[in-house]
Every structure is written in C-alpha cells, then in structure tokens.
Amino acid sequence: MVDITDDASPAQIKQAIGSAAAHYMQTSIRPNDMVGISSWSSTIRAMVDNLHPLNIKTSGVIQLLGGVGPNGNVQATLLTQSLANILNCPAYLLPAQSIERSTEDRARLISSGEVADVVNKFAEVDLALVGIGVLEPSQLLKIPATITTKRC
C-alpha cells in the first residue's frame, strides 16, 4: 500500500509506487531466485531506479516480453540489464518483438535458437515483475517509432 497526498501528480504517484515496490523486492528476493521482468512498464522502471545494489546474487533476470518497434528493444534491454546489474546476475535478453504479423511468424521466432533459449528459461522464473497499469498505453509504448498506424 502506498500513501500519497490527494494532490499528488502522476509522476509522484509512480515514484511512490516504484519506491514501495523496490523496498518490497529488496526484502523479499532470495539468493538464486530467477527474476522475470516485463519491459513495458514505467512503474517497474521506477522500481528499478529505486533499488540499491543487493548483497545477494540471484540466478538471473529474464526479459519476459519483447520490445515493440526499434526503440522498444532498446528500452527492454536497458531495463533488464539494469536490474541484472543491481542483482549481481546475468541478464537473459529476449531478442524478439512482442507483436508478430502472424502465428506462423511467431512459431518461427519461438523456434529460433536465441529466442528459444530464453523462452525455455521462463519455467525457471521464481519472481515475475509485471506492470498492470492503466487502460491507456504506457509512455514506453508512445515513444515515436514504437507503434505505427500502418496496417499489415
């Protein structure tokens, strides 16, 4: 639970939630935990920004969602790697887009070596960090070149 003032801005609310989530994670995570992370959440970004380096080593941080658009993969990589650095562990990056054009494209992608290696690690996740958010798109999805209006 996060206590905020009635006149708190959305940025202040996100900061408060990120700070509380960081505190919870710092007190809950165990050595050798495998952490999965959603890459589209600005609140999770706030949590990572509020974490302090821990004196434990986890098994790894796995990117659970691919990026959307060219900048989406960069953001997902940075968030996953930042958390892995704080947790003193390797980052397992998902080299894929989250949205594919067809189920055939998805099947081809899932069976490719690098993607399959990461997807196979999903079963090892002990703690998954996912943003639930609001109905409107995340600011991370609104970055230019992330979403296009062109129909396929």
Where do the protein language model's features map onto the residues?
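Ligand-binding beta-strand-loop-alpha-helix segment within the catalytic cores
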Residues: 2-31, 55-144, 148-150
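Distinct, well-ordered alpha-helical segments
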Residues: 49-53
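Detector for methionine-enriched segments
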Residues: 1, 25, 34-37, 47
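Gly/Ser/Thr-rich loops at beta-strand to alpha-helix junctions
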Residues: 36-46, 68-69, 134-136
